């Protein structure tokens, strides 16, 4: 192999390693059996959510993962592999791919990385079932508002009772 080819591959490994390091979550899928239209549709959905999907050679992915200390991913880097990287939303790639896989049976989640830790298929699908960030924040807000609301109702009830007595 020529020095230029080796340098090019090292550049690709470095770029993939940087993506692994900077990503909040990574979902690794086998896209074998999907039509071009399905892959295009999946890429569009992911792009709309701020997620980048790339098809990268398994050998480059394996070296990049080892370079950033992500051991245990070698078994998922077999066959046709696409990788979805999300820098902001941890849940988005898992949720979109899991939903898409319900319609496109050929799409198979192989594994992933959540906040720098190697994750199994089960962990990725469990993550996909969580509400998105806005949903979680609204749940938290309603939980925080409940005690204040209850105190307000109690004060109102006491005030109404005092008015009836007077």
Curated annotation (Swiss-Prot):
GO cellular component: ribonucleoprotein complex; ribosome
An annotated GO BP: translation
Keyword rRNA-binding listed: yes
InterPro entries in the record: Ribosomal_uL10, Ribosomal_uL10-like_sf, Ribosomal_uL10_bac, Ribosomal_uL10_bac_type
SUPFAM superfamilies the record matches: Ribosomal protein L10-like
A matching Pfam family: Ribosomal_L10
Keywords: Ribonucleoprotein, Ribosomal protein, RNA-binding, rRNA-binding
Hydrolase listed as a keyword: no
A single GO molecular function term of this UniProt record: large ribosomal subunit rRNA binding
Cross-referenced CDD domains: Ribosomal_L10
Family listed: Belongs to the universal ribosomal protein uL10 family.
Known function: Forms part of the ribosomal stalk, playing a central role in the interaction of the ribosome with GTP-bound translation factors.
Quaternary structure and partners: Part of the ribosomal stalk of the 50S ribosomal subunit. The N-terminus interacts with L11 and the large rRNA to form the base of the stalk. The C-terminus forms an elongated spine to which L12 dimers bind in a sequential fashion forming a multimeric L10(L12)X complex.
Stated name of the protein: Large ribosomal subunit protein uL10
Organism of derivation: Enterococcus faecalis (strain ATCC 700802 / V583)
Lineage: Bacteria, Bacillati, Bacillota, Bacilli, Lactobacillales
Gene that this polypeptide is encoded by: rplJ
């Amino acid at each position: 192999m020529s020095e230029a080819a080796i340098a090019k591959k090292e550049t690709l490994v470095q770029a993939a390693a940087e993506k692994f390091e900077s990503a909040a979550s990574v979902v690794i899928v086998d896209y074998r059996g999907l039509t071009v239209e399905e892959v295009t549709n999946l890429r569009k959905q992911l792009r709309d959510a701020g997620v980048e999907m790339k098809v990268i050679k398994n050998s480059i992915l394996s070296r990049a993962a080892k370079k950033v200390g992500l051991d245990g991913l070698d078994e998922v880097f077999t066959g046709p592999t696409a990788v979805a990287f999300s820098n902001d939303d941890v849940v988005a790639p898992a949720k979109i791919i899991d939903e898409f896989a319900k319609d496109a049976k050929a799409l198979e989640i192989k594994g992933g990385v959540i906040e720098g830790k190697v994750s199994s298929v089960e962990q990725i699908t469990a993550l996909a079932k969580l509400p998105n960030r806005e949903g979680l924040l609204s749940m938290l807000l309603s939980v925080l508002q409940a005690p204040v609301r209850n105190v307000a109702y109690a004060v109102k009830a006491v005030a109404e009772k005092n008015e009836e007595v007077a």
